[in-house]
Amino acid sequence: MQKTHRPRVRLTQALFAGVIIGLMTFISACGGNAHTQKQASQNKTQLDHLLQQAKGVGVPISMLQPVLTQEQQLSHSSAPFTLFNDQPATNYYQNLATRYNQLTIQVQGIISTATQQFQTRAQYDMQNFQLALTRERTSRHFSNIGKFSQQFSQDQLLLSVAQYPKDYIAISSDALYSTNALNLIEPTYVRLNTFQHTVGQMHAASLDTTAMQAQYTADMQDYNSAVAPLDFQNLGTLLDAQYQQALVSSIQALPYIGAAKLNEFQAQVNSLKTYGMDASTYQKHLASYQAALKKASSINDYLAVAARIQADITSMHDMLLQGQANYLIKYIDQQARAWGNANHYHDKFDGKNYLLTAGYTLPGIGFWLNRELGWTFTAADFQSVIDEENNELFDLQMLEANYNDPTQYNHVHATDLQMLDHYSLQHKQVLMVSMAEQAMRIYQDGKLVASFHVTTGRVERPALPGVWTVQDRKSPDEFKSNDPVGSPFWYPPTHINYAILYHWGGFFVHDSWWRADYGPGTQFPHNDSGGDETFAGNGSHGCINMQENQAAWVYGHTDWNTIIAVY
């Protein structure tokens, strides 16, 4: 019996083995090439790793979402099923590997773009922080300014070592927080003065103001110890309440207090008109308030009118800032052109007259102020622009005063000292750049330590006047033109040995090895003795050019805390 069944068993085993081999061949044929499957899997892993890295360095999910969506779609796809032909499946995995690789490259670009965007934003926010800090230093009525100076130095240090979006986001957050607090100092100080004036009027009316004077003293202590926006907001609320209480307690002085409030409102209405804003509604309110105050005979009457006036003053605050910010840009341009045309530079090279004040005109700092206004929405943003504009007006006065100063470029200038005093820079390191002289003087703690001739921006793209902080330092670097080939402003990729960014948007203090000549007049068309008329025969594109060895000295003797003052 065993001999009879043995051939059948062998036949069955052979058939089973054949089926297994055939099935394996079939599965292999339908699954695609193993190498392409592995490559697709590896590329997906690489993409996932890079996405996690992007999230880890602070790239917002919103910027990564298109890639995440595409990856999800790829993950939910599957290889085609075909009999006895693995080429379609192989093609599928090859395409999958390619798409994952493309998405990886896209994520790398997103990381780079996000880093650049947040770096620029941090530089802009730090510039606004510095402007607000300078304004309050100049006002000299807030004794706790040192706390904000320390915070600025700390943020500046963070900016010097920042690498990732999350670093720049944190710097922007700190800068905005401090700027918001600084922007509340002036309104709070005005409220304090109003309260003090009210107490003074009550005292003049022979009223007992002992308690109110004690309140004012306590308020001043709170004011000078404030460090956060909430500190100033709470003090402002308290002052409003104290002012209302003062009105209740001062029936004899109410007519004087009401008149003072009305005068404040009148001044703001006049400012709206000056700025070209529609003040018709507020003008009507003013007339009604004047009539109401004349008729007022009780505390409640005065309180009601005062409350309405204060409501209007509050409501027009943002409108005033917006109007002033837009008005001052044109006003600066007008002032710069008026003086510049009366004191033009006559260029013997081409026989034309040029503005020495081009940096203050609309193509100069005006372009950048208008650009800032283009993304300005909050009161704090408008205030930052106004701070910068007021600085520009002062700097323009310094240029005008320095124009007729016969002092040699390598000696201390009176206008330099005024700049140091006005901006409280006596204990700082300052690169003081005179556009009228085309000279740079370096001051350390108020003392002149070095002087160099420079070349600043041409009339079409002047250097930007103002007091700036260091926003980046690079050695070496390569500059690439944003203008198309054929443009008079285009230049080929250029190696730079030493570069210090003084204003976001690509404004540097740097070496210009292609130039031979520097100093007065080199910001206008001229014959450069080095023979390069294409790139050396005119001013820069807004940068401050220096001889290479001098730029090396400046780079080596400065740091992230150095101030660049251009006037």
Can you name each region flagged by the protein language model?
Residues 287, 291-294, 304-370, 406-407, ...:
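Exported/periplasmic cell-wall-interacting domains
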Residues 2-13, 30-355:
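Amphipathic alpha-helical assembly segments used for oligomerization, scaffolding, or translocation
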